[in-house]
């Protein structure tokens, strides 16, 4: 696929999703059955309306059955499924119904709350529609078929995805909102995080714990002793995930994270990638200065490369109450961020250090334990 975007001055090639792969392979199968000739490429319309020419391999066919595969090409976006083969088997039937299912390497939903029903193959609605339309268009209205999508590497590749968090077990998902993979785009990642959040809400949860990643997750479970069932990753997308909790009408949010990550939010930085915004030292220096810290401490903190290193200086100087001040600012900024949209969301914050453990909370820790057990 020769289509490109530019990001930070560099040129990146776009690719296509597992859903587009499955639609192309399914269409190739139908064409081989109907023409009794091998098909090496097919033209498909993606879920987003883009027309692509997709190469096909591993072709086999007989009078009523065919198999074909398409290799996932994520362009310059090397994700967990890049380069793997998506196989499709199509068998004509005596009915007019077209039935789609997943086989080996395609995950199955085991929990409510996502866009796939419990027990069904993890083929999301948009690619499912696209696959069925591709087959129906080639097959016509008066024939039926059974379609099986499978991926021999799927179970292993799924270990590098968020599927287990979503209750999808046994393989990958067939995905694709637009059918096109856009390199350097965070949209797919954000969508996965939203899906997990939506699943929790659909299960009846009204309060949620947002963590930036594994450190936060581990701290919540093993230091605070809170249930893992309430935890969802927000990664670097703090603002986006806060907006999502509001959209889904969660009543309470507890943000738990390493101080070096969450300190940015106190200054209104809601996307916390270091490449986008790294003002940790500046924020610490400003808050220490407001507390009357001596110039010598401010100068030393400014030189620190990490908040862990700064923490040692802050502790020695007796200014650890700066953590409480900043935690309250994280809470205030976050609530202000959601202020002009309903419903309102109550937000609390817990920050910690790898070396020093719990640093600050916006509510007494025993009260938080009562609320979140």
UniProtKB/Swiss-Prot annotation:
It catalyses: Co-precorrin-5B + S-adenosyl-L-methionine = Co-precorrin-6A + S-adenosyl-L-homocysteine. Belongs to the CbiD family. It comes from Listeria welshimeri serovar 6b (strain ATCC 35897 / DSM 20650 / CCUG 15529 / CIP 8149 / NCTC 11857 / SLCC 5334 / V8). Pfam families: CbiD. Pathway: Cofactor biosynthesis; adenosylcobalamin biosynthesis; cob(II)yrinate a,c-diamide from sirohydrochlorin (anaerobic route): step 6/10. GO terms for molecular function: cobalt-precorrin-5B C1-methyltransferase activity. One of its GO terms (biological process) is methylation. Its EC number is 2.1.1.195. PANTHER family: COBALT-PRECORRIN-5B C(1)-METHYLTRANSFERASE (PTHR35863:SF1). This is Cobalt-precorrin-5B C(1)-methyltransferase. It comes from the Bacteria. The keyword Methyltransferase applies. Keywords: Cobalamin biosynthesis, Methyltransferase, S-adenosyl-L-methionine, Transferase. NCBIfam families: cbiD. InterPro entries: CbiD (IPR002748), CbiD_sf (IPR036074). The keyword Lyase does not apply.
